[in-house]
Amino acid sequence: MNPLRLQAAFLGLVLAGSLGGSPSHAADLPTVAVVATGCTIAMKQDPVTHAPVPALSGEDLTASVPKLKEIANVKVVDFSNIPSYYMGPDRWPALARKVEEVLADPAIAGVVVTHGTDTLDQTSYFLDLTLRSDKPVVAIGAQRNASEWDTDGPRNLLNAVRQILAEDAKGKGVTVTLNHRINAAREVRKTHTSNVETFNSGDAGFLGYVDEDRVVFSRQSLRRQTLPLPDRLPRIDMVAMYPGTDGSQVRQAADSGAEAIVVEALGWGNVNEAMHDAIKYAIDKGIPVIIATKVYNGRALPIYGSKGGGNMLQKAGAVFAGDLTPDKARVLALLAVPITKEQKALQAYYDK
C-alpha cells in the first residue's frame, strides 16, 4: 500500500478511537438504559470478612455480559450501590423520578433496573404505580453474588435487555424477570430465600418467559393503575396478627404518628377480639386500617360476622386489600392515602 494511504488509514483509525467510534453496526442498534441500585447482583465476596459486600458498578455489571454489545447500546445510570434491605420509601420517589427521566429520552428503548431480591417485589410495584411511560421497564436481581461461579446475574441482565427489545414489549408495566420468567410487578412475590427460581405470581401466573430464541408473552396484566407521586410519602405502619396478640402494636402505631396501618391478618382477613378493638380504636382516630391476608394465595374479603371477622371489620371502617400481599398493600397505601382517607374512596384503589 502507498505509504501516504497507509498513514491516512492509520490516522483515521486513531481519530475514530479518540472520538468514541464504534463498529458500524452499533449505530443501528437500539439503546437500553441500565439503572443500577446495587445488592447481590453487584456484590462480591470480601476477602477479609468472607461475606458478600457491594463491589460492582453498573458499568462493571454490563461489562460482565459481552453479548450485550451484540444486541444493544447500553447506557448505565448508577443510582445507588446498597443492599435492597436498605431500599424503601425514603429512596423510592427518587428512583421513580430517575427512571422517568431516563425513559423521557427518545433514544432509550427501555430501562433495566438492577436491584436486590429482598425488596424487589415492592420497589417494582412502586415504580409500576408511579411511572407513566409505556416503554418497558424490567427489574432484575440475582440470588447468587458475582463471586460465585454460577452467578445468575449476567443471564438475568441479558434476558432483561432481550425482553425490552422484543416485539410487543411495550405497555406491560414494570415487570420482574429472573430465571427466564416474566412477572407483573403487582403480582410478583419472592418465595425462596436462595433458589434462583424464587419469583412467581401465585394464582395470576407468569406473563411469559425469555427463551433461547425468543421472548414469549402469554398474557397481560389488566389490573394496573397510575397514581401521582406526592411531595411527601406518609408513614404507613404494618402490624401482624398472631394468636394471642393484645392489639397493643396497632394502638401504639395509632398513637405515635402512623397515617395508616396495614394489618397482616389471618385467612380471609380475620383477627382476634383484642385486635378488633385496637383496629376500631385506630379507625375512630381517623387512621385508615387496611386488612391484608398473610396467606400466599387468595384474597382478603369481609366474610365472617363474628367479632374480629372480616365482615365486622369492614363495618367498623376497615379497607380490604384483596389479593395484594401485606407488603404491597402498604406500597399502595403510600400513594393512595395522600389522596384520600375515606373508606369507600380508599377501597376503590384496592379494588382496581
Tell where the protein language model's regions lie, with residue ranges.
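Sec/Tat signal peptide C-region and signal peptidase I cleavage site
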Residues: 20-26
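Bacterial N-terminal signal peptides
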Residues: 9-20
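Internal gly/pro-rich beta-alpha loop/helix module
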Residues: 140-210
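ATP/NTP phosphate-donor binding region
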Residues: 27-102, 280, 297, 320
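Short Gly/Thr/Asp-enriched flexible loops that form oxyanion-binding sites at enzyme active sites
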Residues: 113-135, 271-280
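Accessory alpha-helical/coil subdomains and C-terminal extensions
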Residues: 28-30, 35-39, 57, 63-68, ...
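Short, acidic/small-residue loops that bind anionic groups at enzyme active sites
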Residues: 124-155, 162-165, 283-293
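ATP/nucleoside-binding phosphotransfer catalytic cores, i.e., glycine-rich phosphate-binding loops
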Residues: 273-352
